[in-house]
Curated annotation (Swiss-Prot):
TM segment ranges: none
Pathway: Quinol/quinone metabolism; menaquinone biosynthesis; menaquinol from 1,4-dihydroxy-2-naphthoate: step 2/2; Cofactor biosynthesis; ubiquinone biosynthesis
PROSITE patterns: SAM_MT_UBIE, UBIE_1, UBIE_2
Annotated Gene3D superfamilies: Vaccinia Virus protein VP39
A GO BP entry: methylation
Name of the protein: Ubiquinone/menaquinone biosynthesis C-methyltransferase UbiE
Length: 256
């Protein structure tokens, strides 16, 4: 009887890479990963993508439709790549909020943008994507780049993003996805599980964080599943664009 009650009240589990962990532990484990890699995050992005991440982000910005005077929220904004570009687009009459749940990443982003002198219209907020601390109908555009796969309850996060958008506002999700052909998929698997942890070891002295990165990509919903999640959350006109043979996809949805 006691064993049955324990089972009934057992904490739900989720994935951390390929591991099955209690939900309460995932956020802590993800935080440890980003505390470890924050200082060399930009360098590793360039090394692992061959600089392609800059092109993926540029296309995302083009799709965003952000213009002067807009209010933009960049979730999991990390070291500030998107925030810096949005800052220039919205100008002095607009606002950019760079939000990240990880204080190490937020500090790196704040220091980097202040050093570049582009933080005048940027606010830095430590925030959980599942429980965004912003008013309803507040932002013209919300973006999250390479962050959604680390969120425990993705459906809750997407609904939270919908809530803070103004009617007609846009959500853009840039994330690793599923390659669209078998040859690319096999090559990408070999690259991910051999080179990525090795590069992590050599550059950051941390192979495990980059093994988690490779595993977390495989556990993330594919393009059509993520599209359906956005529709279920309440977004209209949801579309996605594959880049680099589907290794990365950017999804866009509009708040009705």
């Amino acid at each position: 009887m006691n064993d049955q009650r324990k089972g009934e009240h057992a904490e739900p589990t989720t994935h951390f890479g390929y591991q099955d962990v209690p939900e309460s532990q995932k956020a802590k484990k993800v935080a440890e990963v980003f505390h470890s890699v924050a200082a060399k995050y930009d360098l590793m992005n360039d090394v692992l993508s061959g600089g392609m991440h800059r092109l993926w982000k540029r296309f995302t910005i083009e799709l965003s439709g952000v213009r002067s005077g807009n209010r933009v929220l960049d979730i999991a904004g990390g070291t500030g790549d998107l925030a810096a570009k949005f800052s220039r687009l919205v100008g002095p009459t607009g606002q950019v909020v760079l939000a990240d749940i990880n204080d190490s990443m937020l500090k790196v982003g704040r220091d980097r943008l202040l050093d570049r002198g582009v933080a005048g219209n940027i606010e830095f907020v430590q925030a959980d994507a599942e429980k965004l601390p912003f008013p309803d109908n507040h932002f013209d555009c919300v973006t999250i780049a390479f962050g959604l796969r680390n969120v425990t309850h993705k459906d809750e996060a997407i609904r939270s993003m919908l809530r803070v958008l103004k009617p007609g506002g846009r959500l853009l999700i840039l994330e690793f996805s599923k390659p669209t052909n078998k040859l690319m998929s096999k090559a990408y698997d070999a690259y991910s599980f051999a080179f990525m942890p090795l590069a992590g070891k050599l550059i950051t002295n941390d192979s495990e964080s980059y093994r988690y990165l490779a595993e977390s990509i495989r556990m993330h919903p594919d393009q059509e599943t993520l599209k359906a999640m956005m529709v279920d959350a309440g977004f209209d006109r949801v579309t996605y664009h594959n880049m680099t043979s589907g290794i990365v996809a950017v999804h866009r949805g509009i708040k009705p």
